[in-house]
Amino acid sequence: MTVASVEQMFSGKIQVGSEVTVRGWVRTRRDSKAGLSFVSVSDGSCFAAIQVVTPAHLPNYETEVRKLTTGCAVIVIGTLAPSLGQGQQFEIQAQSIEVVGWVEDPETYPIQPKQHSLEFLREVAHLRPRTNLFGAVARIRHCLSQAVHRFFHENGYYWITTPIITTSDAEGAGQMFRVSTLDLVNLPRTETGGIDFSHDFFGKETFLTVSGQLNVEAYALALSKVYTFGPTFRAENSHTPRHLAEFWMIEPEIAFADLAEDARVAEQFLKFLFKTVLEERDDDLAFITERVEKTTISKLEGFINSPFERIEYTDAIKLLERSGKKFDFPVEWGLDLQTEHERWLTEKHIGRPVVVTNYPEHIKAFYMRLNDDGKTVAAMDVLAPGIGEIIGGSQREERLEMLDIRMAQFGLDPAHYQWYRDFRRYGSVPHAGFGLGFERLVVYVCGLSNIRDAIPYPRAPGSAEF
């Protein structure tokens, strides 16, 4: 007897006629006048559930089988057989059903066999993976995670785990969560009245990281090609469907690379991810296309087959100014592009993914390399139809004197970044990298409208349940 997953049965890995054991949860139960019950069982291994044909002669048929409701946990032993009904290829002809866990009160069980609003499901995030949508999102998220590591491994990158607790603000924006063990009721004070962090756990002021980039740069300047993939945190009091306080970031870093090489890798990377998810999660994407976003599959296929357009920020501004469209946000050289501008460029004007390069220096981070014009930095944003910016990257400033100037412009204390400055003192080379918010990627692939549905337990202002 083989313990088999539903995925193994539907993919042909289990031979028809085999005696199998399947373990999972009841989706639905339907009783027949012919003295049978049809129990749909899902184990989460794929989108489909398998139908279990349960005869009335089973010893627990009346006492247990006919009382099964959505969410009950069962172990089924039976024979895998061709299905006589419509809608699926195989079924299990049950020899026994063991009820492992009952749903205490089926009437109040939150995940009923009906469509629930996404707002409601966020309130029961611990149970929402049992729904069709969030089961699909979880499997797609897993597939994309594995594809990230596979792409970099196959292309000679090393995975570096960067710290979550840090003393540095990698973006220079100041929107950071403080980490402290100090007694908030009785804070130690300095002579000037400030908080004396020398009494804190680390002996200095520390935060949750907003990016692993600064740390991973150190390893790029020794191992040539590296990446980090881990949680990051932003204390940005934003309640939009595009922002989370805790999310995962993918950040490769490449030594001896310029902005053009950075953009080339970003294009290869995204196309690899989308190709992989189309190949490996076709069942989940079929459901997404049917129920969430009709164009999901064609959108991803179009992305893979389209060469990315390259355009400079200055030229993008000119196109937007000449578009004749009235935007909600102003279009002016020196202002950052908003989502509506990005989507007009990639959807209405160019019709495919776009890489916008060379942004004004004052709207980008301090570590980006100043161009020869003295006004722009070697930065890029990859814009995708349907979402706008999906990747942000740059060539890093490898010249110590220029880095110091940029840090002064941002009001950053060089003493806090002495270790980062050391990279420019000891064998500095041109290098580049980019960042991709993993949840934004999941949103794009799954056609979701709210990023809080792209992560198992969303953290946002006023929301840290579970």
Curated annotation (Swiss-Prot):
The species this protein was found in: Xylella fastidiosa (strain Temecula1 / ATCC 700964)
Organism taxonomic ancestry: Bacteria, Pseudomonadati, Pseudomonadota, Gammaproteobacteria, Lysobacterales
InterPro entries documented for this protein: Aa-tRNA-synt_II, aa-tRNA-synth_II, aa-tRNA-synth_II/BPL/LPL, Asn-tRNA-ligase, Asp/Asn-tRNA-synth_IIb, NA-bd_OB-fold, NA-bd_OB_tRNA
Superkingdom, taxonomy of origin: Bacteria
The protein's name: Asparagine--tRNA ligase
Gene (UniProt): asnS
Record's keyword terms, sorted: Aminoacyl-tRNA synthetase, ATP-binding, Cytoplasm, Ligase, Nucleotide-binding, Protein biosynthesis
Any one Gene Ontology BP term: asparaginyl-tRNA aminoacylation
EC number: 6.1.1.22
Location of the protein in the cell: Cytoplasm
NCBIfam families associated with the record: asnS, PRK03932.1
